[in-house]
A protein has these predicted regions:
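Conserved SAM-binding strand-loop segment of SAM-dependent methyltransferases
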Residues: 36-42
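Rossmann-fold NAD(P) dinucleotide-binding segment
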Residues: 67-80
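Residues in the short beta-alpha loop(s) of Rossmann-like NAD(P)-binding domains
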Residues: 22-25, 89
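Short loop/helix-cap segments at secondary-structure boundaries that form the rim of catalytic
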Residues: 26-36
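Adenosine-phosphate binding glycine-rich loop
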Residues: 80, 86-144
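Structural motif
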Residues: 56-57, 82
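Short amphipathic alpha-helix with an adjacent loop that forms part of the alpha/beta core around
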Residues: 43-54
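Glycine-rich adenosine-cofactor-binding loop
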Residues: 1-15, 20-22
Length: 144
């Protein structure tokens, strides 16, 4: 949650349009994320409520495959320009195996930034959020 809170602050300051998807209302709450679009539904249902396209980005931060994997699958199928997922190299290896089993090609899976963020060396929530937003901004400019 802390990484997401810092990330939202950075993204807001850069004028990104933000939607938070998390079925767990105790994580994705108005108290934690005031003035943001919060969808407390599973990704399969949540993506029906927002318009996404090749100009969309996805940052998966839950560490829960039941939440992150469907979101990543949606992003891959809809050709989001940026897709990133939090987790260690081992977590990402396991994620890639699951996506391959779900029918995604190696080329598609390689579009996911995992572990997410540029290597700054930091371990704190604000440092991780900064590394993620830096990678997102870089991809945003490369996408134009």
């Amino acid at each position: 949650v802390h990484i997401a809170q810092y990330l939202v602050d950075f993204a807001n300051s850069l004028n990104f349009e933000i939607s938070i998807i998390d079925p767990r209302g105790y994580f994705a709450s108005e108290q934690r994320f005031p003035d943001l679009k919060i969808i407390n539904k599973w990704p399969e249902e949540a993506f029906k409520e927002i318009e996404t396209n090749e100009n969309s980005a996805l940052i998966a931060l839950t560490h829960d495959p039941k939440i992150d994997d469907p979101a990543l699958q949606h992003a891959l199928k809809n050709k989001f320009y940026y897709i990133g997922a939090l987790g260690s190299k081992k977590t990402h290896e396991n994620r890639c195996k699951r996506l391959k089993e779900a029918g995604f090609s190696e080329k598609e899976i390689n579009l996911i930034h995992g572990p997410i963020g540029i290597k700054l060396g930091g371990k704190s929530a604000p440092e991780i959020a900064l590394s993620i937003i830096a990678q997102l901004v870089s991809e945003t400019h490369n996408n134009k």
